[in-house]
């Protein structure tokens, strides 16, 4: 019997191969979507898409999955639990499980949507339930300072500017009050800003923005969850399971649980991408860096060389008995 092929643990979809098609015509007008990550890429946990709504609407409905989003272009209106909010590029948020929502766009708008758990297959019971037509109420402007706002956020370029974040924020600044909950994380030439997580009431996934400075690197590692990356600016080299790719704006890359991957900025330019993960990361052991365990292996090898031959033999037999 021939050995079964191992499941592929990563997938690249180039911008050139990303195709928008009409979807959900029973409940939407003017909507097109490209399925970037899903069952067809090997994902068990997420459905990532690029949506475009041109002079159209999506009727009021609920999902039995969570849906995060990030606005790329345009000013669509999101009706979330009956309240309309006009969004703009950089706006993002989460639509919790079971919360009624609808969309309307007077012009053209594009956004990334992230669904977790992965939407059900066509031959399974539905995970989407239409409630009625799209509301027509006049929307309000997005105000992220309003403490009643639970699910929405707005990312600006200054939120990723580490030098600006070194100075104090004005009490009248039109942003969420600065704190550890809204902080940007900087390491190894990389800046990470959380957009959608438990702070915005996401329970099943996360979404965040990633900036790489010239020469930045993330050494080989893997995770106990899946990740997807949608390129926005610059070029980055990614190595996944020993295969190397160059990612450019509009490209989508996905890594499965246990896919060992690394990122290298090699052109001397700034890089930015939108990243998602599902399930949400655990409190500990989100990363498993290869270099840490290689270090342990090296140390163990040095210890073994320093031991008498007899002692090394006894350690080996004891280990063999313990592991069976």
Segments from the language model and where they lie:
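Glycine- and acidic-residue-biased ligand/ion/polar-headgroup-sensing regions
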Residues: 56, 64-77, 81, 225-237, ...
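Short acidic-glycine-tyrosine-enriched beta hairpin
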Residues: 82-98, 242-258
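A short, N-terminal "cap"/entry segment at the start of jelly-roll beta-barrel domains
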Residues: 1-44, 126-204, 288-324
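A structural feature that tracks compact, well-ordered secondary-structure segments
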Residues: 207-210, 236-238, 251, 258, ...
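Conserved short histidine dyad/triad with adjacent acidic residue
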Residues: 32-34, 48-63, 189-193, 208-222
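A short hydrophobic beta-strand segment most commonly corresponding to one strand
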Residues: 94, 107-126, 254, 268-287
